[in-house]
Each structure stands twice: as C-alpha cells, then as structure tokens.
Amino acid sequence: MKIPEEEVALLEDYVSDSVDHRGFPAGKSSTGGWRSAWFIIGVEVAERFAYFGIACNLITYLTGPLGQSTAKAAVNVNTWSGTASILPILGAFVADAYLGRYRTIVVASLIYILGLGLLTLSASLIIMGLSKQRNDASAKPSIWVNTLFFCSLYLVAIGQGGHKPCVQAFGADQFDAEDPKEVIARGSFFNWWFLSLSAGISISIIVVAYVQENVNWAFGFGIPCLFMVMALAIFLLGRKIYRYPKGHHEEVNSSNTFARIGRVFVIAFKNRKLRLEHSSLELDQGLLEDGQSEKRKDRLNFLAKAMISREGVEPCSGRDVDDAKALVRLIPIWITYVVSTIPYAQYITFFTKQGVTVDRRILPGVEIPAASLLSFVGVSILISVPLYERVFLPIARKITKKPFGITMLQRIGAGMVLSVFNMMLAALVESKRLKIAREHGLVDKPDVTVPMSIWWFVPQYLLLGMIDLFSMVGTQEFFYDQVPTELRSIGLSLSLSAMGLSSFLSGFLISLIDWATGKDGWFNSNLNRAHVDYFYWLLAAFTAIAFFAFLFISKMYVYRRLDQV
C-alpha cells in the first residue's frame, strides 16, 4: 500500500531517536540544527572563558601568592589539569547511564559555580592574610586557607568534568545523523564550535590574566564565576528548541548499553573454546564492503563468539558485538593520542614561565602578562578555521572525491606531525633565550629581564592553534562518530581524558627528571640555569614515535560507516 505524500512529508519532518522538551518526536522545522546549536556554542564560550580564566595563570598564582617552587607548581598544575581532563569520563558515564546530557549539564554547572565562588573566597582570604604579613618576605598562606583553595580548585575540575563532554555531545545531537545535509553540517559544527570557544579563551586570557596581575587575584577569579552563571542562564534559555536523545525522556535506562556491551566480552570468553561458524562472521561483516570484510577477518573475531548459541545462555546480537568491537578498535588510537598530547601540558606551565623572563613589551610602554601569550592560540584558530572550512576542505574534496575531504584519522595524523615540529621550535627558541642570558651575564640574575622580545615565542603559540584544529577537533569528531550512539558522551570524554592522562604523564616526567638531574638540573627554579629545551627535545621524540605508531594502527582501522572510509 502506497503511503500518501502528506504522511511521507510528515515522517520526514521528524528526527528518529530524538524528542523535544515535552517528550514528543522532535520536528526538524521547530527543533535542533543551527538554531539550537548556537545556544550550546554560547554556553561553551562562557564555560571556556571561566576555565581558562583559572588555568592560564595558575602557575603564576602558585609560584606567587602561594610561594611554591617552579617544579612543584608545574606538577600541581599538571595534576589539576589532568584530573580536570579525566573526570569527563565519569561525567559522561553519569550522563549516558543515568541523568541524560541535559540534566548532567545543569547539575555540573551548579557545582562549577560553587567551586569558582569558593575559589574567589580563598583568594580573598589569601590576599588579606599576606597583606597583614607584608613585612615578612617568607610569609605563606595558612594551611586551612591553602586547603580551601585546592578543594575549590578541584571542585571546579569536577564541575567541568560533567559539563565538558555533555555540552559538546548535546550540541552534536542537534543534527540528524540520518540526514546527509545535517551530517555535513555536524562536521562544520565541530569546526565552528572550536573557533567560538577559542574566541572565549582568547578574551579570557587577555582580560582575566591582566586583572589578576594588575588588580587582584580575587577579582580575577570572580570574573570567571560571573561568566559561568551567565553560561547556565544561556543554556536554560534554549530548553524549548533542543533535541533530546530519546532514551533520556523515556523509561529506557541507558545503563543497559554498558551492560549489553560488557556482556559481549563475558559471553565471548565463556565461548572461547567453541568453534566460530562462518555464518556468524558473515552476519558480523554484513554491513561492510568486501575489501573491508577481508580487512576485518583476522582481527577481533574472538568477540564474534558471543553470538554462538549455547544451552542456557542467550547469545549476543550482531549489533552488540559490532559495538564492542568498535570500542576495542579505539584503544590503540587513544593510546597513541595520549602520548602525542604530552606537549599540550607545557603551554600553561613552562611556556608561561619562560615568557615571564623576557621583554614583554608589544608596543612602547605597553607590557602584557606572560599568560596573555595564550591568546595567540585563539588568534591562530580564528584564522585557521575559516581557511580550513572555505579553502582547504573544498580543495581536499575535489582531490579525494569524498564529502568530508580528508578522513578523521588523516586529520589527527596531520596534527601529530605539527606537534613534533612545534616542540622542536620551542626547544630552539629556549636555546636562544639561554644563549642571550649567558651573553648578558644574567645566568644568576633571574629577576632581571632577558633582552629578548616576547615575539620570539609567538610562532609556537600560533602553531598550537593549528595543531588544535587538526588533532584535537579531529579526535573529538572521531570518537563521537565511532562509538555506539548511546555512548557519545563517553566517546567525547575519551578524547578529553587523553589530554588529562598526558598531563599526568607530563607531571610524572617532570618529577622523574627533576629527581634524576637534581636541583641544578633541567627544571631549576632559576630558568636561566635550567634546561627546559632538553625536555622539549625529549617530547618531540616521544611525539614522533607516537605518530609512527598511529600511522601503522590507522592503516588497519575499520570505520563503522562506509562514508568515512
């Protein structure tokens, strides 16, 4: 029986697996798309403004009012940054299994605001305490004020851990994965998302860092708190036009996703001694082209044993096995990405400390805080994203004959190569800074400005923006796209957790090298006697090794969808 044209049009106007704020099927004309995505992008701009208002100058605060050594402060910053980047896994689990993305964002925002408020309070108490002891050069904040500061700092990490993976996944949810036009729009969403949040980061770095160093730290921490309140208000304004994943508006418990995928591994292990029938393999490979099936035959067939029917045990479905395989395939990619992102930890630690030692005048009489150098990352992204969208992708599409221009893995690999060159550049610039310090007899005068312009450091920050555009955005889109639909918050949290783990690895390397080389080694508190350039060469080598491993793994990777191959 032929379906009337009116009914076809009506069916096409709704998005499968999505509902509106009332729980009814989400209409394309009234919900989602760019109209709701811009609300969510606005939220992320405000959130990144708040986060980087704390992160960009944290090492200066730790070595200043808190009186920590450079090495200890770098480890503390890396530990906090790493924790903040790994917590999104927990936030994504809570969202995908229990609360849903919308509710998780609201709860996480409230925790975020509480943490920023307490951080402002602790900074006020520290300022008041130090002002009473201004004649004592060795004065440090009391233990309980220190404790309040670090507790509030980690409360911020918890808040952003719930906020970060859910906001981006919720934004991508606004585009219909079954509509070819909206799929391409979703790819653009990730690019413009990154450009917008980079604008927020750049403004934060310029404004907040200046306030912190030239007004006071309490006011400098209070501004991010105000912006986070604004972020929550903006998010709630768009409630009626959002598309919500269907599972979180019905009685369906998304934790079943974790259970069914976990069950694949359990049943496959129990069936490990059974022989796999050829029909099971065909079922598992049915959605792939012949070339891709051949590619898959020798790998992960162990998990297909979960589909074998056995007395007393219900077999897993082909979909469950495919979802489990998709997660397993991501692990090697994730590991190489973790190693390649260790250099990221340096731009809020050693890059900033190096900037403090040089001539920071950008114009006669105009001196900028060292942390403001981070704004050049945003400038690079603001220039690179439109060029990538309007110039690079059209050319790539003509060459490759593919709608996406280049694959997501090719995009990530390009970012890794740029990261190697960036660490080499950073090492050369630091070598020059040390040479100038020696030539002017400033090796033992750390408080005297090294006569080297801060503009020497700008290229490595501009290159960081390009690395973010290729590697970070590519990784976020890749993990979002390649995980099961119900676990997309988890997918995005995997890319974020890689950044977190790399921060921990960076902190571990710093502690290990500092212990091995002694107080006059690579990380001397007097940077004119240190050798941070050696550390940068080491990171360049690690990143190069990670890239070649990534290259080998990516050649064998099987995409979940044929249009990504």
Swiss-Prot record:
<feature type="transmembrane region" description="Helical">
    <location>
        <begin position="534"/>
        <end position="554"/>
    </location>
</feature>
<feature type="transmembrane region" description="Helical">
    <location>
        <begin position="217"/>
        <end position="237"/>
    </location>
</feature>
<feature type="transmembrane region" description="Helical">
    <location>
        <begin position="331"/>
        <end position="351"/>
    </location>
</feature>
<dbReference type="InterPro" id="IPR044739">
    <property type="entry name" value="NRT1/PTR"/>
</dbReference>
<comment type="similarity">
    <text>Belongs to the major facilitator superfamily. Proton-dependent oligopeptide transporter (POT/PTR) (TC 2.A.17) family.</text>
</comment>
<dbReference type="GO" id="GO:0042937">
    <property type="term" value="F:tripeptide transmembrane transporter activity"/>
</dbReference>
<feature type="transmembrane region" description="Helical">
    <location>
        <begin position="490"/>
        <end position="510"/>
    </location>
</feature>
<dbReference type="GO" id="GO:0071916">
    <property type="term" value="F:dipeptide transmembrane transporter activity"/>
</dbReference>
<dbReference type="Pfam" id="PF00854">
    <property type="entry name" value="PTR2"/>
</dbReference>
<keyword id="KW-0812">Transmembrane</keyword>
<dbReference type="InterPro" id="IPR000109">
    <property type="entry name" value="POT_fam"/>
</dbReference>
<feature type="modified residue" description="Phosphothreonine">
    <location>
        <position position="104"/>
    </location>
</feature>
<protein>
    <recommendedName>
        <fullName>Protein NRT1/ PTR FAMILY 5.15</fullName>
    </recommendedName>
</protein>
<feature type="transmembrane region" description="Helical">
    <location>
        <begin position="110"/>
        <end position="130"/>
    </location>
</feature>
<keyword id="KW-1133">Transmembrane helix</keyword>
<feature type="transmembrane region" description="Helical">
    <location>
        <begin position="189"/>
        <end position="209"/>
    </location>
</feature>
<feature type="transmembrane region" description="Helical">
    <location>
        <begin position="142"/>
        <end position="162"/>
    </location>
</feature>
<feature type="transmembrane region" description="Helical">
    <location>
        <begin position="454"/>
        <end position="474"/>
    </location>
</feature>
<feature type="transmembrane region" description="Helical">
    <location>
        <begin position="368"/>
        <end position="388"/>
    </location>
</feature>
<feature type="transmembrane region" description="Helical">
    <location>
        <begin position="80"/>
        <end position="100"/>
    </location>
</feature>
<keyword id="KW-0813">Transport</keyword>
<keyword id="KW-0472">Membrane</keyword>
<feature type="transmembrane region" description="Helical">
    <location>
        <begin position="409"/>
        <end position="429"/>
    </location>
</feature>
<dbReference type="InterPro" id="IPR036259">
    <property type="entry name" value="MFS_trans_sf"/>
</dbReference>
<keyword id="KW-0597">Phosphoprotein</keyword>
<feature type="transmembrane region" description="Helical">
    <location>
        <begin position="49"/>
        <end position="67"/>
    </location>
</feature>
<dbReference type="InterPro" id="IPR018456">
    <property type="entry name" value="PTR2_symporter_CS"/>
</dbReference>
<dbReference type="GO" id="GO:0016020">
    <property type="term" value="C:membrane"/>
</dbReference>
